[in-house]
Amino acid sequence: MLFFYNLKEFLKAFTLLSLVFAFILSLYSVLDVLLLYKTANLRIIPEAMLTTVLVSFYYTAPIINNLSLMLYLKRVFSKSYDKIASTFGISPLRFFAPILIFSLFLSLIQFALSYSFYPYIFKTAYSLEREFRKGKPQEELLLNDLWLSLNNAYIRIGFADLRNKKVHDILLVSLEEGYITELITAEEGYWEGENLRLKNAQINLFEKELQKQADVSIKFIPLEEAKAFGEKLNHLSMGRLISLYFLAGKIGMNRELYLAELLRRLVVSFSNVVILSPMLLALVRERAFLKPSTFLLIYGSIYIFSLNSVKIAAEEFGKNPLIGLVPFLVLSFICARSLYYLSKG
């Protein structure tokens, strides 16, 4: 009975704040469409509102969850329900178990939705902005200065427009026992299946001391996989990220980028429970809201810093993004410690 009462009261607070949050964002979205979009088409307003709310909720759910906790505890503390429960030997962990279970459930739901649902929402929001706000009807699938290793060869593509399958400024260097055996350069070419077709390529075969000019076909990777490399990472499903992680390793690309995006989704999803647990302990101990509010700012900052540090480690330094995960792991340790103290009362 106590379990369902606490769950009901917390869900009231969570629903109220979520609705307020959604209303403010919806209003912002409508004004954004009417005032800033080049094509103020009224039919896109519902879609723009929905994508804005969902994209924002994805990142701010941990904050809404903790604000809901504070709103819920205001009622609990005013009635001293937790103190009454403690006289019957009920620990804070047991008393607040419904809130912790809900937060864990919310984390799991967010993580499951980040497999393909949220990437679809991010892509839709991006497409709407490009088409109606910036007047660009299609997503650009461009690759610049791309270096790949394939078997015993290195391929450089200066520029590729994956929408029309064209590539420009191509260089291929074949090696054998550390020596260059073949050098192929071409100004332009195009993708055909798993092959790159190069027009009027300059071919140098050093072992045979032969130089010639001809059209060449190079076995490469399928265009669809190349398109994935040109897409924004948050538009890719988790399954695609995992496959690209292994593929990038085989062809010499920076595969850490794809691991970083997976870790970012993990951080966003499980921050719902990781931040709430130490906040709950601080609120129960203080039975006030000023000092715990400071903790919320600190934990929220660690959350944002973790998202950025994971990305920077992979993108800027080409390092394993697990290095950037350290702040979140520290926060996770604080979460586990908080649960222990809550169980002890």
Residues covered by each model-derived region:
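Transmembrane alpha-helices
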Residues: 1-147, 231-345
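Non-transmembrane, extracytosolic/lumenal segments of membrane-associated proteins
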Residues: 43, 47, 103-207
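Short, non-transmembrane cytosolic segments of multipass membrane proteins
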Residues: 58, 215-235
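Membrane-interface helix/helix-cap signal primarily in integral membrane proteins
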Residues: 203-219
